[in-house]
């Protein structure tokens, strides 16, 4: 008994001494205050797809709260928030998830193709940044706006389309814009009196952006599912908007799907792809598009480019045992010729 008490006493003394020693730093270097830089690397990231050069271009961020998903889910808001916290998703000053807005540039060697064009100078409470950063990212990546000859919007929401025009002038003067007929029917052709009050502002933004290109005959149309230009097939992913499309690129046996807004929050919708979002024009169709597309994407093991995935928005899908999906982002590596 005495031996046990002695052992406990010695252990306690050692713990006390150790804790006191660790409470104070061993060394204190002389202070050397250096101003923080508080800047980030330029907003682009590049990979090769066969012979095609693919560049992700950061345009800014939107603040998306779990409330936007709660009305389209069997999960409670608290459960949705838990999914977000589990992924350590960064938050904005207003408490929403800091959600990237990403466009993609594909240089095929024959054409310089921009998929989506960012928000430009459109103002909306969900946008974190006052102005889009697409052009700054594009120039940091070594390209100029006037070099782009083809623009493929996945749809005509402001964060994907308004960046084609700033203050009524074309940002991409030498580009032709290709729109699906299904998207055109709503955004460009619907009489204003037939639009809902909620839609009028968003439609006005889309029409203002398209106007200078329409005036100069720089807009062409296709049907969802068609090969839009050689080597680029449109993939119907309807629901988010009536003519929402992805675009599939293939080079030397490697394939990439640019899926636009198929997913808005990877923490929620990868685990529960049945969950829709308030921005969907037709949540039932959007849910169906996602549930149909994700298994096929995972099975084919193709590269994915997503507009609202964590930057650079490039990676692959794996099927999880619980029926959800795991997002596997690309890793940094140099471009080797």
Question: What is each residue range found by the language model?
Answer:
Residues 1-22:
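Gram-negative bacterial Sec-dependent N-terminal signal peptides
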């Amino acid at each position: 008994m005495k031996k046990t008490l002695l052992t406990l006493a010695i252990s306690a003394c050692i713990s006390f001494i150790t804790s006191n020693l660790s409470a104070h730093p061993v060394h204190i270097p002389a202070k050397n205050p250096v101003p923080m830089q508080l800047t980030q690397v330029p907003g682009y990231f590049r990979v090769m797809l066969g012979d095609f050069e693919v560049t992700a271009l950061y345009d800014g961020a939107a603040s998306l709260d779990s409330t936007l998903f709660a009305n389209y889910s069997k999960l409670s808001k608290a459960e949705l928030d838990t999914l977000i916290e589990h992924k350590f998703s960064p938050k904005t000053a207003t408490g929403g998830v800091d959600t990237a807005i990403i466009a993609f540039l594909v240089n095929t060697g024959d054409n310089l193709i921009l998929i989506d064009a960012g928000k430009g100078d459109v103002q909306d409470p969900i946008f974190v940044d006052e102005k889009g950063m697409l052009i700054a990212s594009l120039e940091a990546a070594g390209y100029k706006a006037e070099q782009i000859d083809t623009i493929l919007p996945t749809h005509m929401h402001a964060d994907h389309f308004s960046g084609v025009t700033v203050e009524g002038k074309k940002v991409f003067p030498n580009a032709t814009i290709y729109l699906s007929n299904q998207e055109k029917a709503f955004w460009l052709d619907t009489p204003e009196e037939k639009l809902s009050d909620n839609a009028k502002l968003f439609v006005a933004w889309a029409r203002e952006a398209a106007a200078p290109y329409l005036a100069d005959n720089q807009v062409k149309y296709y049907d969802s599912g068609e090969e839009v230009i050689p080597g680029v097939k449109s993939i119907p992913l309807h629901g988010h908007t009536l003519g929402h499309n992805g675009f599939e690129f293939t080079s030397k046996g490697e394939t990439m799907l640019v899926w636009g807004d198929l997913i808005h929050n990877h923490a929620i919708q990868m685990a529960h792809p049945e969950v829709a979002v308030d921005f969907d024009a037709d949540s039932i169709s959007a849910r169906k598009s996602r549930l149909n597309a994700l298994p096929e994407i995972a099975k084919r093991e193709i590269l994915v480019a997503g507009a609202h995935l964590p930057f650079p928005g490039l990676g692959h899908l794996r099927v999880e045992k619980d029926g959800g999906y795991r997002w596997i982002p690309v890793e940094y590596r140099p471009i080797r010729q």
